[in-house]
Amino acid sequence: MKILSVENLSRAFGGIKANNNISFEVEEGTILGVIGPNGAGKSTLFDLITGYTKANAGKVKFFDKDIFGLTPDKISNLGIGRTFQKLKPFADQTLLENVMIGSFVKEGNIKKARDKALEIIDFVDLIEKRHHFARELSTGQRKRLEMARAMAIEPKLLLMDEVTGGVDQKTIPGLVELIKKLKKSGVTIVTINIILILLWRFQIIF
């Protein structure tokens, strides 16, 4: 079953075409890799799909629902999660509080949100850091936090932007294993990440 369909998606900034008639489909339960040189519009593509930037033209469907033009919160509520290349945690809140923001939106109950957040934090192997402020975490730990925050909405589809970018070589294998575990849990993944693409050799788009 197709979980995501993108058709002729385009966005220009002035005279610069960031994305020009991009079309692709993602099957549920798979991983799709997006590759291209710096400045090719890969992150912008994620912004267009998730509503953070408005497209000039095109169609985006999540399963059979048209999500083109919807706001990020509505797209998120449908089950599309997103991580960012530039990490955006709430620096003065704890790891637990960061994840609870998303889980509370999903659960609507403080206790359930806390329990769900702790479950996710344990999943990303940060349970011992749950009471640490986000600003105290290493880059690799903040990458895991970014994934945990995206997982808090229980996404069916997760768009991952350079999840291993900016970390040292020793940290990368652990992040790769975490992504493997995430896929096994049933989440469909679209990733901008050359390391994962080389390791797994899954379907790619340019």
Q: How would you label these PLM feature ranges?
A:
Residues 58-65, 78:
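Conserved ABC transporter NBD signature motif
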Residues 112-129, 177-180:
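Conserved ABC ATPase "signature" region
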Residues 35-37:
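The feature captures the beta-strand-to-loop junction immediately N-terminal to the Walker
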Residues 154:
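Conserved catalytic motifs of ABC-family nucleotide-binding domains
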Residues 133-137:
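Conserved ABC ATPase signature
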Residues 158-161:
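Catalytic Walker B motif of ABC-type/P-loop ATPase nucleotide-binding domains
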